[in-house]
């Protein structure tokens, strides 16, 4: 009788250990199957299509506003975007841009219109945890409803972290704009560089973007000092100030972005 009880207890113990071992193995296999991903601080103003090294199933919803006070009018630009990763390392995004202008002149009316639709893709072709670096390429198709045209924007991204809290990122590529009525083609070369410091064990960061647009006539450079606050594991808000330092643009601006991880 005692032998039967001992055998039963042994079988029960073996079964328990087997279940725990199987669960641990399954969990380890699941973790092992996840592709490498390096966390990089993402710029607030010129944000990316999706996280670099995105993993399948990740989704995010953003709303933002760019507010500029000018001599003749107060201009506001609003954006709504949805981004997701259908497969590992590939991000897709759809963004709509709206513009509102409130005239400060008596004989000029205000306006409100849908400006652009942006459809983007981004693929991280190199992800290295060892070097804390990621390289990616992408493409954005822009449909301009105001000027009547479309723009083609291939781009390249390189990001690198130092000591886990210091982040640098470069986003660069041409934007070729084609206008239907005149059949004219214009090109702007974009170089956007960002540097950030992330607060340890939080989703907060502080940093700066240097946004440059280069044409045959000038180089427009705008600094965007910025801050991001992680309000929860899914919700964050980012704020930036636009400070033009070269080019024809002289007006200060402010920008905010609300980020929600779905």
Regions found by a protein language model. Give the residues of each.
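Transmembrane beta-barrel domains of Gram-negative outer membranes and organellar outer membranes
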Residues: 29-262
């Amino acid at each position: 009788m005692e032998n039967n009880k001992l055998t039963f207890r042994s079988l029960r113990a073996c079964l328990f250990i087997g279940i725990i071992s199987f669960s641990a193995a399954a969990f380890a296999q699941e973790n092992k199957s996840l592709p490498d991903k390096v966390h990089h601080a993402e710029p607030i103003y010129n944000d990316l299509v999706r996280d670099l090294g995105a993993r399948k199933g990740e989704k995010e919803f953003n709303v933002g506003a760019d507010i500029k006070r000018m001599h003749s009018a107060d201009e506001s630009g609003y954006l709504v975007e949805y981004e997701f990763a259908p497969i590992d390392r590939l991000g897709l995004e759809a963004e709509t841009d709206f513009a509102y202008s409130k005239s400060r002149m008596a004989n000029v009316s205000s306006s409100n219109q849908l400006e652009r639709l942006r459809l983007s893709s981004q693929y991280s072709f190199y992800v290295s945890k060892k070097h804390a670096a990621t390289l990616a390429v992408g493409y954005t198709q822009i449909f301009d409803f105001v000027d009547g045209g479309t723009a083609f924007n291939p781009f390249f991204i390189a990001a690198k972290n130092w000591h886990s809290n210091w982040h640098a990122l470069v986003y660069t590529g041409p934007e070729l704009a084609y206008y239907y009525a005149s059949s004219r083609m214009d090109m702007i070369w974009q170089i956007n560089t960002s540097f950030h410091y992330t607060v340890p064990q939080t989703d907060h960061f502080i940093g700066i973007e240097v946004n440059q647009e280069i044409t045959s006539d000038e180089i427009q450079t705008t600094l965007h000092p910025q801050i991001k606050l992680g309000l929860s594991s899914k919700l964050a808000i980012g704020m930036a100030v636009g400070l033009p330092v070269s080019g024809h643009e002289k007006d200060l601006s402010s920008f905010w972005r609300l980020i929600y991880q779905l």
